[in-house]
Curated annotation (Swiss-Prot):
Pfam annotation, one family: HD
Residue ranges of domain HD in the record: 18-130
Organism ancestry: Archaea, Methanobacteriati, Methanobacteriota, Methanomada group, Methanococci
Protein name, UniProt field: Uncharacterized protein MJ0778
Highest taxon, organism lineage: Archaea
Amino acid sequence: MEFEKALSILKNLCSENVVEHCLAVSEYAYELALAIKNKGYEVDVELVRLGGLLHDIGRSRTHGIEHGVVGAEILRELGFDEKLALIAERHIGAGITKEEAIELGLPPKDYLPITLEEKIVAHADNLIFGTKRVEIDDVIKKFEKRLGKNHPSIKRIILLNDEINNLLK
């Protein structure tokens, strides 16, 4: 599916601020994917670009924690590739464990990013507040304020940040 068609669908479903955020995440994720590919790693840069664009399509129906799961459902309903649906489903923070999903009222399974493409989009999303790129310290502060200093998702965010940065060395 080409970028412009996906962007048109996103614009039809989501508010302007969500679209602008998705464009910023897509651009940053694409830059990261190209840089990682240039280091010799196997990465589907177009999947990352589209995944970044569509990761928050679930916000057309909800802004709750379930927007990743809802987004994956929307993408499947619209006939998008399963790889894109999984990017949406697994992009929140650095993922959600099955145990956390149960506590949050999500369908009971792991929502942790597995593929490199999923990880790049989740990481890029973490580092974009609205349309602005921020540092990892800002991300950690935001999640600590929201979830508490010792929440396991914060450690996962730091590990994901380290993993992506190591690929760029």
